[in-house]
């Protein structure tokens, strides 16, 4: 009897201002696990705000595959959305990456809240309004909430083969972070989106939701959620130098709107100049400065001004494809 495999096709819908993840399952016989074996598929774009009802077919082009850690004989297949004629759909952020190779390295720091649908607040949110401060990298039942959920997600990501480099509890209650490193903007974006999908699916089991909004608690004295992007190319890693790094930072400062436009919706609520952020209207960079737009890590300095920079402005709900594309574009324009 032929072995049956479950292929979960994942894509981004047309909702604005922040796209959501969608998925559906295809069953294949004698599937060996390669991307080349994954056929194009279609879906009803009129149900995802990506087409009109009278001409509703959109195409799914597989671009990334990994093991599905939650299913027997399962695979996760990240897809680009195409129009019926095969051209990139307007909602296809991956297609905005014009130049992509392994020379550009990306490390994303994905923050988010574990959200309790019953209270409509972060998991463990204090009734007595305990101020933040005790929750960052914390331990213990008074400080840390949802560790079992987080550990399960970490295991799922590792079992899927995603390059997660670490996790930690964040500054606000119920807020967590994981880090993913990959070479190439498309590969990094693929891994972030699949990891987000796994976070959502894992949370279902616990009756929880994942809140990607950058400031879900509004204008309160609680940190928002970002997705800091650490980046470098061969020139930054091999040549480096204070002049080169400053030159790149200055180029980012000349393109504030270009970056903010793709760094995530509602980011103005987070980038206020408070809570370890620079104002969305300003630009600054500095060594180890977590209140700057771009932080120059101490490790970069110690390595002779060689290595990575960290743009702290992207929000937790930002599209890593679009973020990677603009980081590459601006960095290259500085040379």
Feature map (PLM): residue ranges:
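Glycine-rich, acidic/polar active-site loops that bind/position phosphate-bearing ligands
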Residues: 1-335
């Amino acid at each position: 009897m032929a072995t049956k495999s479950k292929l979960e096709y994942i894509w981004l819908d047309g909702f604005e201002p922040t796209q959501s993840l969608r998925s559906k399952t295809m069953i294949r016989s004698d599937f060996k696990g390669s991307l080349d074996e994954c056929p194009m598929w279609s879906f009803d774009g009129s149900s995802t705000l990506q087409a009109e009802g009278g001409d509703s077919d959109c195409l799914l082009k597989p671009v990334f595959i990994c093991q599905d850690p939650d299913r027997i004989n399962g695979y996760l297949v990240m897809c680009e959305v195409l129009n019926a004629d095969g051209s990139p759909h307007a909602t296809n952020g991956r297609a905005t990456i014009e130049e992509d190779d392994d020379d550009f390295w990306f490390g994303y720091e994905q923050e988010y809240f574990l959200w309790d649908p019953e209270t409509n607040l972060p998991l463990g949110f204090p009734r007595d309004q305990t101020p933040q401060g005790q929750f960052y990298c914390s331990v213990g039942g008074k400080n840390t909430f949802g560790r079992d959920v987080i550990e399960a997600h970490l295991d799922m990501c590792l079992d899927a083969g995603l390059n997660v480099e670490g996790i930690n509890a964040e500054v606000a209650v119920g807020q967590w972070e994981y880090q993913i490193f990959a070479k190439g903007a498309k590969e990094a974006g693929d891994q972030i989106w699949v990891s987000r999908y796994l976070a959502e699916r894992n949370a279902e089991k616990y009756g929880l939701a994942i809140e990607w909004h950058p400031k879900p608690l509004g204008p309160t004295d609680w940190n928002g959620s970002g997705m800091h992007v650490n980046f470098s190319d061969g020139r930054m890693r091999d040549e480096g130098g204070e002049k080169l790094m400053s030159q790149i930072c200055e180029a980012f400062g000349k393109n504030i709107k270009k970056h903010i436009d793709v760094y995530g919706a509602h980011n103005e609520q987070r980038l206020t100049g408070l809570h370890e952020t620079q104002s969305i209207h300003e630009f600054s960079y500095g060594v180890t400065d977590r209140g700057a737009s771009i932080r120059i890590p101490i490790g970069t300095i110690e390595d002779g001004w060689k290595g990575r920079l960290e743009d702290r402005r992207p929000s937790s709900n930002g599209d890593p494809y679009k973020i990677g594309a603009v980081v590459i574009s601006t960095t290259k324009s500085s040379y």
